[in-house]
A protein has these predicted regions:
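Anion-binding alpha/beta catalytic cores of soluble intermediary-metabolism enzymes, centered on
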Residues: 1-59, 65-170
Length: 170
């Protein structure tokens, strides 16, 4: 995502073309590290219906599109911006390998709905692979014998693939 854990009211002011391009590069590099040879990345718009030609905001044309152009100039295969309410379906159907979102919940809600028990969060841009189950720590069920280990196993497996990929490329 372009912004981190910030209030929704602050997101628009924190978006920059450079931030969009950096996020696209980060997800591209993370997908390469995970073994995708030609990652395809989509970028979400910020506003409903991508701003509907400025009726609901103009960040898509003033910030996000220039960021996409910058990402392409850096070698990223990136498309968008797309409305957030439809792009995740296209990714789930295999058209895209990763999605750049503008803020935290824009991506987390979709990811958790598509696979709460399987989802993995990757902390990209670090010298070593860092992955965690997307659902978080689950302290509320710790020690009760009811946890599903699927997301933790996927996080571990992905970290191993990323480490192996970094080893073979260096």
């Amino acid at each position: 995502r372009v912004t981190s854990h910030v209030a929704l009211r602050d997101v628009s002011g924190l978006l920059t073309p450079e931030g969009v391009a950096d996020a696209a590069k980060l997800i591209t590099d993370s997908l390469l590290a995970a073994g995708k040879t030609e990652p395809r990345v989509a970028v979400c718009g910020l506003n409903p219906h991508n701003g509907d030609n400025g009726n609901y905001g103009n960040e898509e044309s003033t910030v996000i599109e220039p960021g996409i152009a910058l990402a392409r100039s850096r070698g990223c295969a990136v498309d968008g911006p797309f409305p957030a309410d439809t792009i995740f379906v296209r990714a789930k159907n295999g058209q895209y390998d990763g999605i750049v979102t503008m803020y935290h919940d824009q991506g987390q809600i979709a990811m958790k709905l598509m696979g709460f028990e399987r989802g993995v969060t990757v902390q990209g841009g670090l010298p070593i692979p860092v992955t965690t189950p997307a659902h978080g720590t689950a302290y509320d069920i710790a020690g009760r014998g009811i946890a599903n280990v699927g997301a933790m196993k996927n996080a571990f497996d992905l970290a191993c693939r990323m480490a192996a990929g970094r080893h073979t490329r260096s």
